[in-house]
Amino acid sequence: MATNKRTLSRIGFYCGLALFLIITLFPFFVMLMTSFKGAKEAISLHPTLLPQQWTLEHYVDIFNPMIFPFVDYFRNSLVVSVVSSVVAVFLGILGAYALSRLRFKGRMTINASFYTVYMFSGILLVVPLFKIITALGIYDTEMALIITMVTQTLPTAVFMLKSYFDTIPDEIEEAAMMDGLNRLQIIFRITVPLAMSGLISVFVYCFMVAWNDYLFASIFLSSASNFTLPVGLNALFSTPDYIWGRMMAASLVTALPVVIMYALSERFIKSGLTAGGVKG
């Protein structure tokens, strides 16, 4: 009787999981199929799930700079995402280590402030950031967006990295100090390598936030040559002669870097999240 209950429970679980996957993946499947349909077939009054005539014209179009400067937008997004992520992780290492290892006045207040940040929406920072960026004279530049993305991701980076550093035994660093290493040497020779899975997790998080950002990019960038992919895609959607297949192709190619990055770093992300959630 107990075996039958377990079997039924397992069947129900896998059926529910299959239904969830179908609901989740079906829109992406439709996007993929639409990207292979011709312009007229994509808006047909009698749509089909699979293309009647397969075509790669939309993928060719998005890489044609005369039609859509996808490569330029991709480069801008890549520069902003990589640079802001590297800066956020580097500063996060220093801040997280200080909160995890050093004892100083106001430490708990600073630590609590990182929790408080999560209570506020990012849009509340638009006005102060806009004033700072215009005062610095970097409006409509990649640097403006890099600074904004670091501002957005740094609190989370510090919060997550502190959890990882808390799992590293103090005895390891004490032994290193006895061998003559200073604080910076300990951080980059011992602490950082031991927390590498956590660093990769934080980098992927920061990269995804910067790569997918539309709000700040649409406010701080005005020249088409500086657009990132989210803003560029919105411009593509706003054209009067929009072509659904081209939009779906551009959207899918835009999502590929994040998907590939997550797939390659999945093992590190899982181990990093596990390590960061356990104290000891």
Swiss-Prot record:
What keywords were assigned to this record?
Answer: Cell inner membrane, Cell membrane, Membrane, Transmembrane, Transmembrane helix, Transport
Q: Which GO terms are recorded in the biological process aspect for this UniProt protein?
A: transmembrane transport
Can you tell me where the transmembrane regions are?
11-31, 54-74, 78-98, 118-138, 141-161, 190-210, 215-235, 243-263
Topology relative to the membrane: Multi-pass membrane protein
What is the annotated signal peptide range for this record? none
Q: Does the keyword GTP-binding apply?
A: no
> Hey, which stretches end up on the Periplasmic side?
32-53, 99-117, 162-189, 236-242
Q: Which residues lie on this side of the membrane: Cytoplasmic?
A: 1-10, 75-77, 139-140, 211-214, 264-280
Where, per UniProt, does this protein localize? Cell inner membrane
Instruction: Show the CDD domains listed in the entry.
Output: TM_PBP2 (cd06261)
What stretch or stretches form a coiled coil here? none
For the keyword Magnesium, the answer is no
Question: Which residue intervals define the domain ABC transmembrane type-1 in the entry?
Answer: 74-265
Q: Which family does it belong to?
A: Belongs to the binding-protein-dependent transport system permease family. MalFG subfamily.
Protein's recorded name: Inner membrane ABC transporter permease protein YcjP
